[in-house]
UniProtKB/Swiss-Prot annotation:
Keyword Protein biosynthesis attached: yes
HAMAP family, per the entry: EF_Ts (MF_00050)
Homology family: Belongs to the EF-Ts family.
Any one GO molecular-function label of the UniProt entry: translation elongation factor activity
CDD domains in the record: UBA_EF-Ts
Gene3D superfamilies noted in UniProt: 1.10.286.20, DNA helicase RuvA subunit, C-terminal domain, Elongation factor Ts, dimerisation domain
Superkingdom classification of source: Bacteria
Record PROSITE patterns: EF_TS_1, EF_TS_2
Listed name of the protein: Elongation factor Ts
Length: 287
């Protein structure tokens, strides 16, 4: 059994919104397996869904540069949100994305190297660490982008259609954050997990019902799950009566890909314990 650490409990709490003790109990019951703990909590009716894995705590900004045929999206991290709003930081981010686009970079390493001198100057000036974290270049027949503030950036590529359509779909992706483009991309394992959760959650409702009825109920849940998880099956945010895939098809377009960046995805930022900090300061003062 995996050790039930405070970090593991914290992650489960962030993903489910449940209390610390409930999360610890669920993890203990699941033998330290966080995914099983989430499934068990969903099956018991404690939660309806869980956030995607990944602690989101780092600050910074997302930046995009595009010309309708190609785009570069980057993430630059800072230690505080205050710095991310300052002109010096914004100028560094803007210069970095311009450099990445102009040089047609496809990997973050050359950008980090090229911007290192400017980064050191910025760090020396603001007294806070700054890092270029990631970069992706996307090319296609039609490329549209959407930036939500400076925290979420999306790039969508189409075959056919126009840039405005790609931008509309990119805005939808920013709002809904789908996991997949097509239902066919959802793994059999994920579908099986969803099926098992549904059966456990509705155990009383399906008890005694004919197998074919249960099968229809499960099928309905899986259809809904696939619609929620895949972009082409989602209801378009600007017109919920139309699916995103149908929107593209009506315009004579095909969605080829989407890229979603959110500041801090997958980064765990240490959280200072105020009580411990005060205790440490008092101890130091006595020395």
């Amino acid at each position: 059994m995996a050790e039930i650490t405070a970090a593991l409990v914290k992650e489960l709490r962030e993903r489910t919104g449940e209390g610390m003790m409930d999360c610890k109990k669920a993890l203990t019951k699941a033998g330290g397996d966080i995914e099983k703990a989430i499934d068990d909590m969903r099956a018991s009716g404690a939660i309806k869904a869980a956030k995607k894995a990944g602690n989101v705590a780092a600050e910074g900004a997302i930046a995009i540069k595009d010309d309708g045929k190609a785009a570069v999206i980057i993430e630059v991290n800072s230690q505080t949100d205050f710095l991310a709003l300052q002109d010096d930081f914004k100028a560094f981010v803007a210069a970095s994305v311009e450099k990445a686009f102009a040089d047609k970079l496809t990997d973050v390493a050359p950008l980090i190297e090229a911007q290192e001198a400017a980064r050191l100057v910025l760090v020396g000036k603001v007294g806070e660490n700054v890092n270029i974290r990631r970069l992706k270049r996307i090319e296609g027949d039609v490329v549209g982008t959407y930036l939500h503030g400076n925290k979420i950036g999306v790039v969508v590529t189409l075959k056919g259609g126009d840039v405005e359509l790609a931008k509309d779909i990119a805005m939808h992706v920013a709002a809904s954050n789908p996991e997949f483009l097509f239902p066919s991309e959802v793994s059999a394992e994920a579908i099986e997990r969803e099926k098992n959760v549904f059966l456990q959650l509705n155990e009383d409702k399906i008890k005694g019902k004919p197998a074919e009825i249960v099968e229809k109920m499960v099928g309905g849940r899986i259809t809904k799950f696939l619609a929620e998880a895949s972009l082409v099956e989602q209801a378009f945010v600007k017109n919920p009566e139309v699916k995103v895939g149908d929107l593209a098809k009506k315009a004579g377009a095909e969605i080829v890909s989407f890229t979603y960046f959110k500041v801090g995805d997958g980064i765990e930022k240490p959280v200072d314990n105020f009580a411990d900090e005060v205790a440490a300061q008092l101890a130091a003062a006595k020395q």
